[in-house]
């Protein structure tokens, strides 16, 4: 679901973007909870000269529909307009089959799944790993690659599920 929001254009530093994302998360969370939805991720970025707010949502027990996305867009759009003082596109969608893993709860929920992990700092001369998430305990991600790795949650820059398209 894409919705064009109208405001003036400005350039933002990374820290300012993070503050905007935090404000968006805080302001939309009650509405999402009211609809029985979980917030997966919020992106605030510029692409091709246009600004975008992308909100990824899901139900824990069923799939998201286009109608769900439209309902959320209508419910939160005006609140987000109060935070962002520029023209932007508001996009609401499911996170997709290769959804990001952002919170400790995500790592618990998707134990047994194949994931990709990018680290903030090198571990064994590498920053990127792919393997099976065997468990999450005490803020440590246990990842089965050739060996079992233990990765502190705070060292993860980015992580997402990996869908094996060979299973289609």
Question: What do the predicted segments below correspond to?
Answer:
Residues 1-168:
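Short Lys/Arg-rich amphipathic alpha-helical segments
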């Amino acid at each position: 679901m894409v919705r064009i929001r109208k405001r003036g254009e400005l350039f933002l530093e990374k820290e300012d973007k993070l503050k905007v994302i935090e404000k968006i998360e805080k302001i939309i969370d009650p509405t999402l909870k009211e609809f029985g939805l979980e917030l997966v991720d919020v992106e605030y970025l510029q692409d091709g000269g246009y600004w975008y707010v992308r909100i990824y949502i899901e139900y824990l027990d069923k799939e998201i529909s286009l109608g769900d996305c439209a309902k959320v867009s209508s419910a939160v759009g005006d609140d987000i307009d109060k935070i962002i003082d520029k023209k932007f596109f508001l996009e609401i969608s499911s996170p997709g089959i290769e959804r990001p893993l952002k919170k400790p709860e995500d790592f618990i929920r998707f134990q047994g799944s194949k994931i990709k992990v990018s680290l903030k700092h090198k571990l064994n001369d590498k920053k990127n790993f792919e393997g099976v998430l065997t468990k999450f305990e005490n803020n440590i991600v246990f990842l089965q690659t050739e060996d079992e790795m233990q990765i502190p949650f705070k060292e993860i820059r980015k992580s997402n599920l990996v869908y094996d398209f060979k299973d289609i």
